[in-house]
Amino acid sequence: MQNTILIHAPGRRQGRGALVLAYTALFALLMGIWAAIFALNGQSFIQYGDTLKQHYPFLVYYGRWLRQAARCVLTGAAVPTWDFSIGYGADIITTLSYYGLGDPLDLLAAFVPGRWTEQLLEGLIVLRLYLAGLAFMAFSRRHGNSRFGTLLGALAYVFSAWPIQAGLIEPVFLVPMYCFPLMLLGADDLFEGRSPVLYIAAIALTALSNFLFFYMAAVLLVLYAIAVYSKRYGAKNLRTLPPLLAKFIGFALVGIAISAVTLLPTAQELFGSARFGLTRETAPYPFYRFFELLANMTTGMGYDAYSTYAGVTSAAFLGVLVLFAKPRQNTVLKCAWLGLLALLLVPQAGSVLNGISYVSNRWVWAFTMLEAFILARVCPGITAFEPKEKRNLFALLAIYCVVAFCVKQGRTETALLGALLLVLLAVCWRQMASAAAVCRLFYWRAAALAW
């Protein structure tokens, strides 16, 4: 007989607080390890590149401009909106909006002296990652995932390849990680007939923070809404579509109107820029790209010329294999994963999601979020397999290892290490059951002590 641990579970509000507390503690621990690795190598989160050459000067300038604007308001003077020190002279709002002029978090620059801006920028990177995990947990719990699975999914989401590789080079790339889950939660509210406040606020926040990522999030939101509508209503209830569509569009326009002060000038400037209008031949990806992409699913070091940082932890990718090992379950999630994987293999998708410009998979944070959500969904049953499901899992694992490393581009040290960890996790699934039980026990005991 399988041993079970019986323990009184906290109430709903108490359990929510315990979940946030557990996430905060683990996030602080892992972030401390991450920061220690940088410190031991004599580095900080501010990497040479756009972070140092663009985002750091922006934050220094923005803090100075905010303080000057506050003095102008208090004295009745005009707030400066043009600066001749930017190039040969440029509009301040239009020039700086890409870097987060409308992002509420960047308003902290007004209270930090210029000499402390480096620490502020590093702190904002950590804060955005923390908020990304909180937003993911809210979305995951709304869709019925367990607290323990949600906790694992949030950590897999936050410490994936995208924030490590792209977020440190361009801190603004972290914005959609916490804005997009809020947009999805707002969409769920509209489907369920709830208040549109969250939907409007999420639209406005994303559009204020960065126009390009708002565009990507909007396209992906449409795909999400189509999937939810198809599952909820189906093709036989199309009479519900017009009023629902009117609500989605109408409330989205309200959110866009709120953000118009930075959104419209930024969009005009962006669409008129030479870089944005740059066209390149969108030839098919090389044959080995599929194998290279699979090999890098379990590593944070995968890189190509298209910003395809799709790596997650080995545990998260094991969740994907478990998902497909169990037939006739979570069909929508399976279709979603295959659909987004297909988009990563089509260069035209990267062009469309990059504003119909050059090919770039900067939307891959959504793929990472999906894999983290899959881990949260399958976590309760990750150690409970029927004999057929167990055979399916190891067959998928064998296929992955063969396919991922059949070309030399995929046989990197980090990819091999990630695959090795994946195999070890799959082989030690019985021990994982005991470890999961102990972790759940510790989780509820900590909740009881904390509350």
Regions found by a protein language model. Give the residues of each.
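Periplasmic/ER-lumenal interhelical loops and adjacent helix-loop junctions
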Residues: 53-72, 97, 104, 244-336, ...
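Transmembrane alpha-helical segments
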Residues: 132-139, 179-191, 219-227, 317-320, ...
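Membrane-interface micro-motifs in multi-pass membrane enzymes
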Residues: 94-99, 118-130, 156-184, 191-192, ...
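Start-transfer (signal-anchor) and selected internal transmembrane alpha helices
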Residues: 1-38, 243, 247, 430-431, ...
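Membrane-interface coil-to-helix junctions
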Residues: 30-136, 155-177, 270-275, 282-309, ...
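Transmembrane signal-anchor helices characteristic of membrane glycosylation enzymes that use polyprenol
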Residues: 16-52, 57, 251-265, 450
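Membrane-embedded helix bundles of polyisoprenyl
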Residues: 27, 129-143, 147-232, 244-267, ...
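Contiguous transmembrane helix-bundle modules in multi-pass membrane proteins
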Residues: 213, 335-342, 354, 360-451
